[in-house]
């Protein structure tokens, strides 16, 4: 079985408090289409969504980034068309809060994947070189086959985005896809 993990495609990361901006806006249609496709196929779909408490001065990101994805705020809402897909299909999509870069860190993601005998994980979302990267590394270390949809990933750092795509392919053995077609970088 396959799984799609949609990482941090929220208002705060697209246009809000820690915005990727235009690169994230540009993937809106594609990320919604890929999510719809996985739901339709009956694959396991996970919304891995960053959550923070504004007063948590001990969280390591507190020193690195402005407050973002604060619990109970509109910044944590899924962005645009992905929000529409989620609302229409939420009974078939697993929502998972995460507090670290990797969707595996401190969550039950590994357990959820193993219970469903998932062997192949497809990754989409933001930021390519932060949360998508750390999730991919943890997936690799757990023995999952990794597919990254390059046309569904974005970062506020263009060089970091390109570096991460190369790292996925060259160091993690991940398959990269654009329009569902494998590519080589």
Question: What are these model-derived regions, one by one?
Answer:
Residues 56-60:
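Metal-dependent catalytic neighborhoods of phosphoester/phosphodiester hydrolases
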Residues 1-3, 33-41, 66-185:
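Active-site-adjacent betaalpha module
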Residues 4-9:
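N-terminal nucleotide-binding beta1-loop-alpha1 segment
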């Amino acid at each position: 079985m396959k799984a799609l993990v949609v990482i941090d495609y929220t208002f705060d990361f697209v246009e809000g408090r820690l915005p990727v901006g235009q690169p994230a806006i540009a993937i809106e249609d594609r990320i919604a289409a890929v999510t719809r496709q996985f739901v339709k196929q009956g694959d396991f779909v996970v919304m891995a969504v960053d959550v923070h408490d504004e007063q948590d001065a001990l969280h390591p990101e507190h020193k690195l980034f402005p407050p973002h994805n604060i619990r109970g705020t509109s910044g944590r809402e899924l962005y645009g068309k992905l929000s529409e897909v989620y609302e229409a299909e939420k009974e078939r999509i697993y929502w998972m809060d995460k507090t670290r870069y990797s969707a595996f860190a401190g969550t039950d993601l590994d357990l959820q994947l193993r219970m469903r005998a998932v062997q192949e994980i497809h990754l989409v979302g933001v930021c390519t070189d932060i949360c998508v990267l750390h999730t991919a590394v943890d997936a690799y270390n757990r023995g999952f086959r990794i597919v990254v949809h390059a046309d569904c990933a974005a970062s506020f750092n263009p060089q970091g985005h390109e570096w991460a795509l190369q790292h996925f392919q060259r160091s993690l053995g991940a398959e990269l896809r654009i329009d569902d077609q494998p590519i080589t970088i």
